[in-house]
Amino acid sequence: MKHLTEMVRQHKAGKTNGIYAVCSAHPLVLEAAIRYASANQTPLLIEATSNQVDQFGGYTGMTPADFRGFVCQLADSLNFPQDALILGGDHLGPNRWQNLPAAQAMANADDLIKSYVAAGFKKIHLDCSMSCQDDPVPLTDDIVAERAARLAKVAEETCREHFGEADLVYVIGTEVPVPGGAHETLSELAVTTPDAARATLEAHRHAFEKQGLSAIWPRIIALVVQPGVEFDHTNVIDYQPVKATALSQMVENYETLIFEAHSTDYQTPQSLRQLVIDHFAILKVGPALTFALREALFSLAAIEEELVPAKACSGLRQVLENVMLDRPEYWQSHYHGDGNARRLARGYSYSDRVRYYWPDSQIDDAFAHLVRNLADSPIPLPLISQYLPLQYVKVRSGELQPTPRELIINHIQDILAQYHTACEGQ
């Protein structure tokens, strides 16, 4: 994938550039990202995880081909060139099938890889770090690498079969915490050691060699590591460059390799920039974008309550709360404490489990109702100032239209702007 290999080449030549990956399937988040990339004339990397999207539909109900169609249709409607769009698959492996015996889980993983590659995803994260039902815990580096090499072989064959050439790029390794934010309260986080990173790389190099895949090594562009960034429900562990110095220096010995950092959500702009400078040059962001979406919607719901008689209001927040209580499976095992603590977490937690509920038809109807209510007449400027102060400044300067949709999109783009700036390079 030329955009990514070129980015890595420039980074290794000293440009201190990077790329961020938008990890969300929400249409408004994706619209915000596509419009932002379009305005700034940059390529856009959008990733789906093995939980969201798989050959059986994942929790979004979309297969990889569906997801690609959905994103490409959106890009076309916004006149964004498809050759500037990069699709990635995240944590692809037996992740969804850990409760099955390894043989069965890996057979499913083979099909998962085939479905992603056949659909045109070009950035493939091979992650076989999780133990299956009959596996030891934890798995050895060698077993993890052997399974990843097996999936790489499937990917290469599928790519050649469908596109006539193998032009995939790969990411290997995994961060220590669970994807999507930690379940527990955090205070300190272990940074991946250079020795552990080297062991992962060497195990993979050896396993790829055994599968006859040595030639693809330059297309393994990134190793996922833990640079010491994470968030839980109410706290963020900020990047501390000093703790990652040895890890950062270690990757300088590899000609075509950078690091990929997961869970970079909610880091300060300064930390994001420093991560890229320190070679953690692929920054994954997901929950922070849907968190910004949720913030904008809660603000608009508060404006609606000021302007619209109670009986005509959308009641978005109450509808959301009711649906989350009726279907607690996406938050129950994550949010703890008494009733009030869990209520606050449902609405405001950094881990943003509410993102799983936006596709619900009742919530979607309430959202549409909210937008209709506020689109009928101009939103008074003092209310925008009160509830969306960052957007108010842009409305007053004439650079932003004060419609519900534009206010939401712009609020999400404030987060994207931090990532764009971090990745620009010198």
Curated annotation (Swiss-Prot):
Any one biological process term the GO annotation gives: carbohydrate metabolic process
InterPro entries: Aldolase_TIM, GatZ/KbaZ-like, GatZ_KbaZ_carbometab, TagBP_ald_KbaZ
Pathway assigned in UniProt: Carbohydrate metabolism; D-tagatose 6-phosphate degradation; D-glyceraldehyde 3-phosphate and glycerone phosphate from D-tagatose 6-phosphate: step 2/2
CC annotations in GO: plasma membrane
Pfam families in the cross-refs: GatZ_KbaZ-like
Function of the molecule: Component of the tagatose-1,6-bisphosphate aldolase KbaYZ that is required for full activity and stability of the Y subunit. Could have a chaperone-like function for the proper and stable folding of KbaY. When expressed alone, KbaZ does not show any aldolase activity.
Family assignment from sequence similarity: Belongs to the GatZ/KbaZ family. KbaZ subfamily.
Record text on subunit structure and interactions: Forms a complex with KbaY.
Protein name: D-tagatose-1,6-bisphosphate aldolase subunit KbaZ
Designated gene of the protein: kbaZ
